[in-house]
């Protein structure tokens, strides 16, 4: 993650963490606010979002109910972001993106060392987006190198052409291409267990 490499840990703590104001639920809690996440995501593809809203306006003027409905459905979900706790966000920046604990073999969860090489009977599928500008290609592929004792025939790496970060999890290509591959993979190895 380029941003995590370019900035010191203290920058994230002082610039990205804010206190929830009164009278909101969670008042005084320290969080990485959803609105900051949203701004960060949208600024990566500013021109595309501006164009989408121009199209939305034109669909409204033209009475194109389908275009309006698709836009609203997409943005209702896209704009639904939650605050992340200070602890979760800062630990992720520090231990995952800056210090690379998992590939270095020093990542702990609930005081237990995580050992990916101990995984032997679980199939592994990773999915990445060709155009993902948040989690670049290779970030989840690394799991294949870390899980050394999963047989090769139980591993699948899928790079989805033509999608960015959001498209890996949602949208037409997710529904028509990624999700069916995931289900096929899950069912294949679920049947082998029985």
Protein language model regions, located:
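Catalytic histidine-centered segment of alpha/beta-hydrolase-like enzymes
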Residues: 134, 158-177
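Active-site nucleophile elbow and catalytic-triad environment of alpha/beta-hydrolase enzymes
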Residues: 97-116
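C-terminal structured domain segments across diverse proteins
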Residues: 93-94
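Conserved alpha/beta-hydrolase "acid-adjacent" motif
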Residues: 133-142
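Alpha/beta-hydrolase-fold enzymes
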Residues: 1-87
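C-terminal alpha-helix
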Residues: 181-192
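Short beta-strand/loop motif that positions the catalytic acidic residue
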Residues: 119-120, 125-128, 132
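Short, conserved loop/helix-junction motifs that constitute active-site signature segments
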Residues: 116-121, 147-152
């Amino acid at each position: 993650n380029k941003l995590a490499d370019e900035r010191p840990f203290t920058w994230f703590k002082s610039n990205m963490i804010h206190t929830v104001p009164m009278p909101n639920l969670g008042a005084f809690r320290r969080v990485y606010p959803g609105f900051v996440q949203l701004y960060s995501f949208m600024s990566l593809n500013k021109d595309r979002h501006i164009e989408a809203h121009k199209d939305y306006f034109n669909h409204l003027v033209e009475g194109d109910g389908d275009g309006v409905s698709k836009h609203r459905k997409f943005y209702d979900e896209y704009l639904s972001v939650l605050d992340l706790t200070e602890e979760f966000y800062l630990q992720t920046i520090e231990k995952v993106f800056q210090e690379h604990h998992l590939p270095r073999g020093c990542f702990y969860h609930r005081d237990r060392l995580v050992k990916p090489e101990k995984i032997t009977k679980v199939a592994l599928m990773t999915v990445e987006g060709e155009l993902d500008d948040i989690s670049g290609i290779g970030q989840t592929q690394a799991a294949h190198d870390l899980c050394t004792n999963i047989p090769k025939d139980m591993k699948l790496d899928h790079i989805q052409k033509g999608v960015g970060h959001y498209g890996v999890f949602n949208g037409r290509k997710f529904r028509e291409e990624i999700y069916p591959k995931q289900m096929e993979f899950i069912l294949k190895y679920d049947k082998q267990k029985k």
